[in-house]
C-alpha cells in the first residue's frame, strides 16, 4: 500500500474534511496512457461544470415562468452526479491505467456507458427532468426568449459532453481490445481477488511502467558503433 497522503479533492484547510483519494498522473500513470487519463479527467471536470451551468440555466427557466421542480432536480443532479461520476467511472479507469487491471477496465466500461446514456438524455432535455436540453430550451422560446437563450448554453455543453464521452469510450475500448483484454480476464481477477490485492497491483504497475519504457527504448535509434562520416582532416 502507498503511504502517500490523499490529495484529492484539494479542500481548503478551514473545511473539516480531508481528501479521500491520492491522485498523481506523473507517478501513477505510465507515459503511454497518461494523456488519455488526463483527458478523461478533463472530461469529468467538463461534465461537473456543465451540471453547474445547468443549475444556472434552470434558474433562468424558473425566473422565466418555468417549474421549480426543474431547479430542484438540477441542484440534486449537481451534488449527486459530480462525486458519483468521479468514484464510479473515473477512479476505475485511473486504476485500470495504473495497474493494467481488466476488472477496473470492465467497471469503467459499465459505468461510463451509463454516463453516456445519461449525457444523451440530458442533451435531449425532457421537460420536468431538471435539465436544459434541446427540447426544453427550444420549446421555451415561445414563453421567454431571454431565459431560453440562457438555457441553450448548458444544452450545448451537454451535447459536447455526450459526443466527447462517446469518443472517449470508443478510444478506450479499442485500446483495451487491442491489448488483449477480455471479459474472461476481468472474471479471473474477480475470482482470484487480484483486483484488490495491493501486491498484485504494485507488480502490475511496475510491469506497465517497464513495458512503456521498453517500448520507448525500442523506438530510439540504435548504433552498433560510433558512426564515421568520413570527413577529411585536410585543411
From Swiss-Prot:
<dbReference type="GO" id="GO:0000139">
    <property type="term" value="C:Golgi membrane"/>
</dbReference>
<keyword id="KW-0812">Transmembrane</keyword>
<feature type="transmembrane region" description="Helical">
    <location>
        <begin position="68"/>
        <end position="88"/>
    </location>
</feature>
<dbReference type="Pfam" id="PF04144">
    <property type="entry name" value="SCAMP"/>
</dbReference>
<keyword id="KW-1133">Transmembrane helix</keyword>
<keyword id="KW-0770">Synapse</keyword>
<dbReference type="GO" id="GO:0005886">
    <property type="term" value="C:plasma membrane"/>
</dbReference>
<dbReference type="GO" id="GO:0030672">
    <property type="term" value="C:synaptic vesicle membrane"/>
</dbReference>
<dbReference type="GO" id="GO:0032588">
    <property type="term" value="C:trans-Golgi network membrane"/>
</dbReference>
<keyword id="KW-1003">Cell membrane</keyword>
<dbReference type="InterPro" id="IPR007273">
    <property type="entry name" value="SCAMP"/>
</dbReference>
<dbReference type="GO" id="GO:0006887">
    <property type="term" value="P:exocytosis"/>
</dbReference>
<feature type="topological domain" description="Cytoplasmic">
    <location>
        <begin position="170"/>
        <end position="235"/>
    </location>
</feature>
<dbReference type="GO" id="GO:0015031">
    <property type="term" value="P:protein transport"/>
</dbReference>
<dbReference type="GO" id="GO:0055038">
    <property type="term" value="C:recycling endosome membrane"/>
</dbReference>
<keyword id="KW-0333">Golgi apparatus</keyword>
<keyword id="KW-0813">Transport</keyword>
<feature type="transmembrane region" description="Helical">
    <location>
        <begin position="149"/>
        <end position="169"/>
    </location>
</feature>
<keyword id="KW-0653">Protein transport</keyword>
<keyword id="KW-0472">Membrane</keyword>
<feature type="transmembrane region" description="Helical">
    <location>
        <begin position="40"/>
        <end position="60"/>
    </location>
</feature>
<comment type="similarity">
    <text>Belongs to the SCAMP family. SCAMP5 subfamily.</text>
</comment>
<feature type="topological domain" description="Extracellular">
    <location>
        <begin position="126"/>
        <end position="148"/>
    </location>
</feature>
<feature type="topological domain" description="Cytoplasmic">
    <location>
        <begin position="1"/>
        <end position="39"/>
    </location>
</feature>
<keyword id="KW-0967">Endosome</keyword>
<dbReference type="GO" id="GO:0001819">
    <property type="term" value="P:positive regulation of cytokine production"/>
</dbReference>
<comment type="function">
    <text>Required for the calcium-dependent exocytosis of signal sequence-containing cytokines. Probably acts in cooperation with the SNARE machinery.</text>
</comment>
<feature type="topological domain" description="Extracellular">
    <location>
        <begin position="61"/>
        <end position="67"/>
    </location>
</feature>
<keyword id="KW-0268">Exocytosis</keyword>
<dbReference type="GO" id="GO:0045956">
    <property type="term" value="P:positive regulation of calcium ion-dependent exocytosis"/>
</dbReference>
<feature type="transmembrane region" description="Helical">
    <location>
        <begin position="103"/>
        <end position="125"/>
    </location>
</feature>
<keyword id="KW-0968">Cytoplasmic vesicle</keyword>
<protein>
    <recommendedName>
        <fullName>Secretory carrier-associated membrane protein 5A</fullName>
    </recommendedName>
</protein>
<feature type="topological domain" description="Cytoplasmic">
    <location>
        <begin position="89"/>
        <end position="102"/>
    </location>
</feature>
Amino acid at each position: 500500500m502507498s503511504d502517500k497522503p490523499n490529495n484529492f479533492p484539494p479542500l481548503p484547510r478551514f473545511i473539516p474534511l480531508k481528501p479521500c483519494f491520492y491522485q498523481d498522473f506523473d507517478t501513477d500513470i505510465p507515459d503511454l496512457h497518461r494523456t488519455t487519463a488526463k483527458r478523461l479527467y478533463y472530461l469529468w471536470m467538463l461534465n461537473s461544470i456543465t451540471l453547474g451551468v445547468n443549475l444556472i440555466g434552470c434558474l433562468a427557466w424558473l425566473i422565466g415562468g418555468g417549474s421549480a421542480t426543474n431547479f430542484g432536480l438540477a441542484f440534486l443532479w449537481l451534488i449527486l452526479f459530480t462525486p458519483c461520476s468521479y468514484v464510479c467511472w473515473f477512479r476505475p479507469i485511473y486504476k485500470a491505467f495504473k495497474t493494467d487491471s481488466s476488472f477496473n477496465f470492465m467497471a469503467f466500461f459499465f459505468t461510463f456507458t451509463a454516463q453516456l446514456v445519461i449525457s444523451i438524455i440530458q442533451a435531449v432535455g425532457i421537460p420536468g427532468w431538471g435539465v436544459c436540453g434541446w427540447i426544453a430550451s427550444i420549446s421555451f422560446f415561445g414563453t421567454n426568449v431571454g431565459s431560453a437563450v440562457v438555457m441553450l448554453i448548458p444544452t450545448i455543453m451537454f451535447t459536447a459532453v455526450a459526443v466527447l464521452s462517446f469518443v472517449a469510450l470508443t478510444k478506450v475500448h479499442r485500446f483495451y481490445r487491442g491489448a488483449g483484454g477480455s471479459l474472461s480476464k476481468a472474471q479471473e481477477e474477480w475470482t482470484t481477488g487480484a483486483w484488490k490485492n495491493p501486491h498484485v497491483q504494485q507488480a502490475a504497475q511496475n510491469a506497465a511502467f517497464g513495458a512503456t519504457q521498453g517500448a520507448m527504448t525500442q523506438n530510439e535509434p540504435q548504433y552498433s558503433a560510433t558512426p564515421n562520416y568520413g570527413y577529411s582532416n585536410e585543411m
